[in-house]
Amino acid sequence: MSPLNCIFPPRLRRIGHLLSCFILLPGLMSCGVANLINSPTATPTATITPTATATLTPTPTLTPTITPLPILCGGPPVMFILLVGSDGRAKSYSVGLADSIRLVRVDFVEPSIHLLSFPRDLYVEIPGIESHGGITHGKLNQAYLYGNPGYGYNEDGGLGSGLLARTLEHNFGAQVDHYVAINLQSFVRIVDALGGIDINLPFVVDGRVKGSKDSNLYFSAGKQHLKGYRTMLLARMRPFGDFQRAQVQNLILQALAKKMLKRSVLHKLPELIDASKDSIQTDIGVVEGGQLLCLASKLNAKNIEFVSFPETIFKNGRVQDSVLGNTSIVEVDFNILRIYTQKFNQGTQFEPEEGLMDGNQR
């Protein structure tokens, strides 16, 4: 299957079949009429005197109207949230790269959440910071770094997440309404506040260097319960590369969502949010937060899907960067990525990530 074919799910293919039926229908009808016109005429046996018949007034045809679905929880039809996992180890968000980058599409009409992962090593144009050392390009995760207060390159607000959002929009046409950034310390506290997570790993993840016996860095395949610190370690490991790490991160996010949607936890969410409000960086206000909490009560695990770009459209490369020097990057045809992102914006998702079909959704 070509990369572009992956964009169109079975739902669109079914629509294509329906359109074909409508195209063929006039041809079938005209065929039937032609047969009636060209059939031989029998010799009349009697002349029938016509009688007067009443002319019926045609009944006007009513044009069907489509009733739009209601928008739930007082929210907008769709809300886009940039979710950033920062590798910053301090309590503040003054420095740090974007360790994970997810664009979240929240649908308030057909209650659902979709998360799209962007490779952090994409080499992109970073807008608006050329006056700082002539920087025009960098890795996608550097856009978050340059916008943080420790660098101060971002002069348009929104800190690191704001510059990262503008970079995603500039390069790929991504839409971002709000952002949430979580650093390592905050992530550990959130997982522990939830009582840990239950995850089903489809493969062994071993982050130990040769000769190391640190059991914290070894994760067996299968079901297991993890607390905050080990969950953070698992999220950061990439023994198989960045794409497999993104897959594991999605499994962790899925396990977190599943835990948060439990009735025993859902009613505690306001307390959890209040307890973590000083350790999470976000521009989501009280109104939007209330809308999201309301929608959460209408969701289950089946309403949350993780989608990803097919790995086959990417390749590893190297570039001479003004800051990093000769560095490894991820290369891709930006036009293809823009098409995927546009489909995501519109709610026409491509197939859910295959790696998630391992039991965590059951």
Language-model features, listed with the residues they occupy:
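Residue-level detector of alpha-helical hydrophobic segments embedded in or interacting with membranes
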Residues: L4-N5, C21, H114
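Terminal accessory/targeting
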Residues: L4, G27-S30
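Bacterial N-terminal signal peptides
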Residues: L18-G27
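Non-catalytic, solvent-exposed segments at the cell envelope interface
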Residues: G32-R362
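N-terminal secretory signal peptides that target proteins for export/translocation
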Residues: M1-L12
